[in-house]
Amino acid sequence: MNLNDFDFLLPDKLIADRPVSPRSSSKLLVSKKLEQFMDEKFYNLPKLLSSNDLLIFNDTKVIPTRLKGKRIRGNSSSLINATLISYDKDDCWLTLIKPLRKINIGECLNFNDGVKAELIDKSEGFGVLKFNIKKNNFSAFLSRQGFMPLPPYIEKRRASDSRDIKDYQSIFAKYDGAVAAPTASLHFDHEVLKDLEHLGVKSSFVTLHVGAGTFLPVKEINIKNHKMHTEWGCVDQSTVDKIIEAKSRGGRVIPVGTTACLLYTSDAADEGLGVDLGGRRI
């Protein structure tokens, strides 16, 4: 497939930079048959499901890993944004830095709370920062100074702020590890979950920590040549049992969003259901 086949016009006025409130008041496009579409509200989702169905959610939790810092050179300084992707070793973190191109290896970047980091390597759009703070102290530092990483199309319109801590986290997020939220999950609120439970719709969870690739553009004209970054995922035995049970009673297994779908299908295709997939390209 050619990358240009996916180009289309989307007017700026149709792009929201904040989610609707309440969450479940968002729009829902329903396709019952090929080329037959209906506009709905998300809070009506329970009416489209049956008691035999099983929803699979991704319970990953987004870490506020976006840091705002300064690059100081002589008497001048410039602002930089650094999004921590993963811990390497020896207080080093793989980081998405903007603007990385202008920063030289060996330069020191300054963050709040007296935290500093040296750029010790950079390649393929990422930098490796060595911090003057230990890994076991990083969670407390991020809770004070970290912001939620936002999609690039929103970043162009506004800066990340404290509201995003809640807005870009699903209500059932449990396990720390993602740099971005599994977006489909953000539409669910407690009322919708209660309605689903009342109707007898079952649910279960998988964990896929959304990785750095979600923020990187596809540059290959032939998208088959695009290299995906690794992501960690797990489908536990409890979820496997619920999937088998749902299929045995004639129900549908419905992954919520692409992250849950990719993990579910990758697990089944490669290993058979029920494994810790670890870090892999899925």
PLM regions with names:
Residues M1-S266:
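Surface-exposed, charge/polar-rich loops and edge strands
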Residues Y264-I282:
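Single conserved hydrophobic/aromatic residue that forms the stacking wall/gate
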